[in-house]
């Protein structure tokens, strides 16, 4: 009986080793195909942008134009940063013409988002520091806190020293609680930020449980799974599980590519892992794709 148990344990371990790589191989092939099909995904997004621009040309009021520019900004963010900046500036001008301070601040936060997205952290912080949370509505305050969180997270990622990295990570952590307090408990935004907080606190199992729940919800509702997937990839990276890190980086990268997102991190992180494993050709393809999309995004 003992020998049978040992045999079954060895067999199951062997099977798991074969099942997991084949799953990753399948995901990588899907990612390869998605990269080849990038032009059609880009065309679809551009058609959505063109439709909004047609509505803008036919709009009859500043309020209608302001709302349409908000939608247009959403289409341009993570796609064409120079265009996103132009749209944000248009929103500022419209808001001033409408003499609506709340709208002005909202549009200025869009500009801060773009500055942060193109690594102009000083300029982004100057805009944020010039805005008071008391001058914003509830959704604006949440957005405001998130931009502070984002800039400090990115500054931590690219900090020169470990001391500076920890300093900026600490600043970003302070905003996690602020963001969580502004979001509806149980909502996807609430849960995703809670998972980030748990990762910072090294509570990896709890974070993974939340992220898997978010992943399932996003999948069921037809949302992009890019964000919960990159969260899971980060969690497994902290735990030293390279195989699951690769799996979720691949899933996140597929979602990004198919959504015609041009500003992303999953693909080049995956490329780095594959390069370390000796898959030089695929790593080169992924880095080349990332560079092309970064150039397109400006």
Model-derived regions, located:
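A "functional boundary" signal
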Residues: 2, 7-10, 15-298
